[in-house]
């Protein structure tokens, strides 16, 4: 396991390095005017622009710029925002919004895991019964209906009949977070329920379950001590990635409820050509995805040490 973990860690770091390099090179292919604010473009002469670019090191050879870029990354220095918040460190610009998305994402993921897994267990336990039909109908509905429609239904029901605020507000964080968290949870609950039901139903057809019944084990013991444990093994691989992706923010949900989180930040940065913010966000999202996959692989091996996730050398 240690050998595989180290190997996957090295692969993840190399992937992050390559993505960061690719993003850096793509940013350098853009016109240099995007490195100035709109006010600077109007006021600066060509000589002043050249001097500013030289001072920022943007006229240095690409290899030299790359070395400086990697050094800055190691020190968590991502530069300053030039258009969204002129002069503010990118870390500060992203940090405030990341905190909001992280809080909503973690709460939504926790709710989704508990409700979704429990729903999947009950569907598997009462397969082809009324509860299973209801759960399946919910899963189909959530996946078939566009997110904007389901968000609108939640908004109307939650605001009209339950009195929750329709827009996110920093003055009333708790109440105004209910509808966004609900919308984030809807699809995740359906996903976890579907996975849990599927894997548990598959396990219920295994020979060892028939043997357990012959030995006289109760349905509850079979379901929770054997079926659920084995069914959760393939699921845990996706849980870290799901959490990290959710924490990264939801563009549609955050736009819909005016949540000042991570979701709209990338599109705003692209539209306003704030290159340092764009560069940092792309790298951040890549890191979240890669770390999620890495943690999922390792977690699956921790849950069931019998599993060998492997290359050819480990299969021998």
Model-assigned labels for residue ranges:
Residues 1-13:
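N-terminal Sec/SRP start-transfer signal
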Residues 2-3, 98-131, 147, 171-316:
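Alpha-helical transmembrane segments of integral membrane proteins
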Residues 12, 97, 101, 137-144, ...:
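Residue-level signal for discrete positions within transmembrane alpha-helices
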Residues 16-67, 161-173:
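Hydrophobic alpha-helical transmembrane segments of membrane transport/permease proteins
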Residues 23-30, 137-165, 185:
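Membrane-water interface segments at the C-terminal ends of transmembrane alpha-helices
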Residues 44-76, 177-178, 257-269:
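Short hydrophobic, aromatic-rich alpha-helical segments embedded in or entering the lipid bilayer
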Residues 54-61, 79-85, 172, 270-276:
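Membrane-interfacial helix-loop-helix junctions in multi-pass membrane proteins
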Residues 58-117:
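An internal, D/E-rich "acidic patch" concept
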């Amino acid at each position: 396991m240690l050998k595989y973990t180290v190997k996957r860690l090295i692969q993840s770091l190399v992937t992050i390095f390559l993505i960061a390099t690719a993003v850096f090179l793509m940013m350098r292919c853009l016109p240099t005017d995007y490195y100035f604010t709109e006010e600077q473009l109007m006021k600066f002469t060509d000589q002043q622009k050249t001097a500013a670019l030289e001072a920022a090191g943007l006229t240095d050879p690409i290899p030299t710029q790359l070395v400086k870029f990697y050094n800055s990354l190691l020190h968590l220095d991502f530069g300053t925002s030039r258009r969204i918040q002129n002069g503010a460190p990118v870390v500060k610009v992203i940090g405030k919004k990341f905190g909001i998305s992280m809080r909503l994402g973690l709460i939504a993921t926790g709710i989704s895991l508990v409700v979704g897994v429990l729903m999947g267990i009950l569907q598997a336990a009462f397969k082809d019964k009324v509860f299973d039909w209801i759960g399946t109908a919910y899963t189909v509905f959530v996946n078939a209906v566009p997110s904007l429609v389901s968000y609108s239904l939640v908004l109307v029901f939650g605001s009209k009949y339950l009195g929750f605020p329709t827009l996110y507000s920093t003055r009333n964080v708790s109440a105004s977070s209910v509808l966004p968290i609900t919308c984030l949870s809807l699809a995740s609950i359906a996903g976890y329920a579907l996975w849990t039901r599927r894997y548990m139903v598959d396990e219920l057809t295994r020979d060892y379950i028939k043997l357990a019944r012959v030995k006289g084990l109760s349905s509850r013991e079979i379901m929770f001590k054997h079926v659920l444990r084995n069914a959760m093994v393939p699921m845990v691989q996706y849980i870290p990635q799901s959490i990290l992706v959710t924490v990264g923010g939801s563009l549609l949900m955050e736009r819909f409820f005016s949540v000042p989180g991570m979701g709209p930040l990338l599109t705003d940065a692209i539209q306003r050509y704030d290159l340092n913010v764009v560069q940092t966000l792309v790298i951040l999202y890549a890191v979240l995805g890669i770390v999620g996959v890495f943690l999922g692989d390792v977690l699956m091996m921790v849950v069931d040490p019998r599993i060998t996730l492997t290359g050819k050398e480990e299969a021998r």
